[in-house]
């Protein structure tokens, strides 16, 4: 069965907590969120019936010298715990992680400022190909 194409006039680009599906692909873009010294959810949703082979990425573009923790959860279990140490000279580069996400999995991406209570803008994205739908 061939996937239906999304018409050019359709608006499929948006931000928010959820995963969106277009044909055999999925994506989620968090938009910018202020991250301070408590864990902030950037993306959260439960996947559908297909397996997702994809990538997650965290972004932060303001050089402040602060340290941040990025977490990826599957069904409330931590599958990735990354601490990025900042410098005042260069921003923390994009952190890019390959993922295989099983069907019907609750996925959550979070960030936390470990060095300061100052709020800093962060983004997260999840993109992938969906198999077995």
Regions found by a protein language model. Give the residues of each.
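Beta-strand-centric surfaces of beta-sandwich/beta-rich domains
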Residues: 1-133
């Amino acid at each position: 069965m061939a996937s239906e194409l999304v018409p050019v006039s359709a608006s499929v680009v948006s931000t928010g907590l959820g995963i969106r599906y277009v044909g055999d692909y999925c994506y989620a873009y968090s938009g910018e969120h202020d991250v301070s010294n408590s864990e902030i959810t950037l993306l959260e949703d439960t996947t559908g019936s297909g397996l997702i082979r994809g990538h997650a990425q965290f972004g932060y573009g303001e050089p402040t010298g602060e340290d941040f923790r990025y977490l990826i959860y599957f069904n409330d279990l931590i599958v990735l715990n990354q601490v990025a140490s900042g410098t005042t000279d260069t921003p923390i580069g994009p952190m890019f992680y390959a993922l295989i996400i099983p069907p019907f999995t609750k996925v959550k991406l979070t960030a936390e400022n470990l060095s300061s209570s100052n709020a800093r803008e962060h983004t997260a994205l999840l993109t992938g190909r969906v198999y077995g739908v």
